[in-house]
Amino acid sequence: MGTGLFGTGQTAIRATQDLQIISGLPPLVREDDNYRAQLTLRNTTAKPMKVEVAARATLLELQPQTVDIPAGEAREVAWNVTAPAQLGQIRSEAILWEIEARDTLGGARDALKARQRIVPAVPLTVQQATLVQLEGPLTLEVVPPADALPGRGGLKLALQPKLAEGLPGVRDWFARYPFTCLEQKTSRSIGLRDAKLWQTVVAQLPTYLDKDGLASYFPPRDGEAERGSDVLTAYLLAATHEAAGIEPGFAVPDEVRAPMERGLIAFVEGRIQREFWSPRKDLDVRKLAALEALSRYGKAQGRMLGSITIAPNQWPTHAVIDWLNILRRVADVPQREQRIAEATQVLKSRLSYQGTKLVFSTERDDYWWWLMTNGDVNTARLILAVLDDPAWKDDMGRLANGFIGRQQRGAWHTTTANLWGGLALEKFSAKFEAQPVAGATRASVGAGAPAAVDWARVERVKSTDPAGAPHQTTWFGAPASPGSLRNNTMFLPWAQEPGRQPLNVAHTGTGRPWLTLQSVAAIALKAPFAAGYQVKKTVTPVEQAVAGRYSRGDVLRVTLEVNAAADMTWVVVSDPIPGGATLLGTGLGRDSQIATQGEKRSGGAWPAFEERSFEAFRSYYEYVPKGTFKLDYTMRLNNVGEFALPPTRVEALYAPEMFGESPNPRVKVEAGR
């Protein structure tokens, strides 16, 4: 149409203020990091300034400073501080800053509020845990782990009137879980009953679907072949359907679910194919999982079984459970009643108990980690499958107790097991537990001061409560969420006396509360540890101001060499970075394409997704073959100080007993020349 009708023109808008504060605080630090908290003050006027700067920060003592700033120039001010250790050990995990600057000559002012995240260098972890029902006084001998850091940790006791109130050990496990694929974000949001996180997952979910409607663990890259996973899609639809039976808000919206259903139907009918590495043939088993998910929404039909060889005796247990659920929901399957009886008999014949712990006779062959399933998942899903079946009524109490017996350190092994497990025990409790709890539960260690839970004060967190208020000073565990209980926990520090001390717990009143007892300690890794993976780290300067030492502004190349003992799917490599450092290669501002040009990859593993944060570099692999692979990443050191680093870690996400760790020394960064 040309410019005749519209005309042309331009203008420039410049907004500024006479005095500006620009933060140079590292976005993340770790407890006891010694660092230079730096700010830049800018004088945008044509006159010199004499600026007084006053700063306040959580648990830090900061002296006011005065600085002369010539016209049109900037000056840096800084305080040498140590990150308060106690802030890294509570849920708020923040140093809150308030900075005010005033020109004493002209009166110009500026103010800034900033928030630094602070995390533990050696985090508290659960060393041992148990879940028991208090049917009488409980006495156990307890002792802190030999290598535990002094003054940290103790015994956490959480009480629930019934299992339907949730499992504190599982919630704590989810709260600490660091990884972020679609399955993990979904499982965490439901496991924590975090409605806000779930809404974020729902909003992002369409970006994870390929053109066929199948979900990917990470958002597909442009131009990639259709690589959405039928296994992940079936899990998402099945798990959210089960969760929605407890809280309807965790259902997948119809408009998001519809393409996923179409993708699974096309997969089952053979109109699309998905081929992934696996140690054995699994197509029939994957189709059963897809049909089980579809059957929950009335989208499965008997004719869809045509390509599947029906052989429940030869299937892994998770496939038999899928088969039983399909038979119950799909009315037009031939010989339906006979096959339900057959599947029930197969499942009952595989059950056995080691003491109170439930195991399957086929446990070794049931570990299909590449399909995100294992004996824990199978037990939870079996409870859900037979909860309302009269033929299983007499088995339910033993099944639930046997499933609790499979826990290690207060939770199960994987995200999928903890999600299914939490749902299973909540639904079991809602059906079979009715007696209320009243009175008081008291606990003490040795001659130490006792603690108590008064059941008259135990109440639910409300959505109207101030955001974060119930848990900002919590020293360990999951945050409170609406609907969960509060005033139901006790903390007992480790006894001052050496050696074993008796823990005594007793309930007076009505009911039989459930006790989750966790032994919590901070233990630093002192030497490399390999359980399926070995990891070696090499740091090489790319740009270095002073040879042989690290200075602010230096650019470093980090090489991680990983040796894998076996083929494995979905492996993550996680390497921490010093406080204030920047990972290059993001393509964002202040990035350097030149500095990252020398990065190399070697070996048979190629990343499906890379995550760059202020805390760590993480690389996720869909498949890692046996043998050695290497990866590089590049970072810039931005802050002066001495910084602690947690261990470098490699972990198989769905076989977490396969992992490797290597400790990292503190990193000292000096001022540049």
List the predicted regions and their residue ranges.
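Short beta-strand segments of immunoglobulin-like
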Residues: L25-R30, T66-V67, G410, A545-R549
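Extended, solvent-exposed functional surface patches
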Residues: Q38, A78, Q86-K281, K287-E292, ...
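Short edge beta-strand/loop segments characteristic of extracellular beta-sandwich folds
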Residues: R36-T44, T559-N563
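Proline-enriched interdomain boundary motifs that mark the N-terminal boundary
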Residues: L19-G24, V535
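Short beta-strand and strand-turn-strand segments in soluble, beta-rich domains
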Residues: L5-F6, Q17-I21, R56-P64, A71-E73, ...
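Extracellular acidic loop/turn motifs
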Residues: T45-M49, D567
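Short beta-strand edge segments in extracellular beta-sheet folds
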Residues: A12-D18, L28-R30, R56, D68-P70, ...
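Long, domain-scale non-catalytic interaction/scaffolding regions in large secretory-pathway
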Residues: M1, A57-L59, R75-V77, V81, ...
